[in-house]
Amino acid sequence: MQRSPDGRIPESSKLSWMLLATKKPGKGDTGSMSTADRLTKAGYIHQSSAGIYTLLPLAQRVVAKITRIVDEEMRAVGGQRLAMPSLLGPAGWQATGRWESTRGELFTLEDRRASLLLLAPTHEEEVTAIVKHMVRSYLQLPLRLFQVTRKFRDEARPRAGLLRAREFIMKDMYSFDVDETRAVQTFDEVERAYRRCFDRIGVPYAVAEADSGNIGGALSKEFHFVSSAGEDTLLVCRGCGYSANTERARAGRGTERGADVHRVVVRGAEDRMVSEFRVVVPAGHRPNPLKIKAVWPVAVHENLELTLVGQFGADEAAALSQAVTSASGSDSDLGYETESGAIKCLVDMLVDNQLADTVRAIGTVQLGDWHLAQAGDACSKCESGTLEAQQAIEVGHIFHLGDKYSKALDLTVLNQGQRSYVQMGCYGIGISRILQAAAECSNADGRGLRWPVAIAPYLATIVPLDGSDRVAELFAMLADMRVRGVRVSEDNVVVDDRDYLSAGFRLNDAQLLGIPVTVVLGRRFKLASEVEVQLRVPGLTLPPEVAGVAVRGDAYEHKAYVHVDKLVEFLTCAFGSHTQI
């Protein structure tokens, strides 16, 4: 953006020109208000219907900054940006089996010819078809293709604002490599790029081992913003840094434990019971359905669902231990025949050693890791630490897919005279989720939001209560300011010129909007050329004096009166050791 030749402030940098209708929080709202409500009251989002939101101009600015960071880091690892259609045919999804397995989450429709279509929740099938059409030789690999588009998912219970929306903005990248070794190298390289993205965004985050779910693949990691309000639970070891979600986490052996017995019912596509069997897990733990399903012959029974049917008491657990001790081969009364004849009884390897050793000698019992880890368990990585629960909000997920999609859709390349399936990966970042998650994690107080500097809609707002004849001068000063060598720019400064509102309303709005720097031109500006500077920056801690200026404040906000000639020096020092713009 360029300033007008006569030095005037562009209309686009004035709040009077913006679609903005804030609502002051009520007295009872300060502690209980959800982040989605805060964003609504601050004029960032507007709910259209359940799980569907309009991103208003301020939110769109935040999204644009998040997208710019992600775009730069994806291009830095060789990503090429494209835009695939949101409206897709079902053929690819039927070929991979996801048309049936995810049908409940798909928005489907028919055109005037009664042809089925779907609104894309993700694009593995489509991008595989594109590469199949255009790539013939391994010499055309690797490829890393990404997009930032709207996605659609029929959430059963849309809630929590943008965190569980039915329409959302997502960055998804897809990688194509000639073999597994190079595909895993790509996975590691993109993981590092993701870390750079979240480092730049400036919200504390965790990287956790994860289950691949319906996407598929054997290698998977999640990126989470750490927040006590998060719906996800991570299990972390403070000793060695191990981190995983509860479905994926593995517990170490620790102390010897007794056993609890659970009955698992396996149901088919038409809710018919295929079979049932017993799972023996450490006392006080629950079986892990994802780990159990991984060993079930899904190829024999499509769309299997595992249902945990209660927990047997201590008496039956003792009886089971006795039964295992005395059992031999197929005479064991623990086993339940399946249609494939594969599984009799699953016994967790972390039950007491005597029982585990006995189980190893019984051919009809399968020993493995069948339980859900929980806080207090020993860490399986370092074997000396203890797992702790940590609440978090998922904002990114990366997968090594292998040949799941390339094999289903017959994507091959010619390599040394042989045709081989391409190895794939997919990498998602929830752009609109980050918008709300960052607001959630930045410790808003009763006065309003607090945005990380890198993604705030504006770096600074000027509130002229007096001395308005010098507003253009201050605007130019802030726009030309450099922090860590980067010019702030006119597009990052806004003036609250809404003279029709009271001074108190505009000052409250400055806090409500969460813009990091507020410069107030009041009486002291007219009398002594001093402006009041308010800093609302997550994680910013300042000493009592910065650049010779006295600073006062609390955990949420810092204030100082600064002579206009020292304003740039003061802000440069305040931000210089904190973050980058």
State the predicted function of each range.
Residues 1-581:
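NTP/phosphate- and nucleic-acid-binding module
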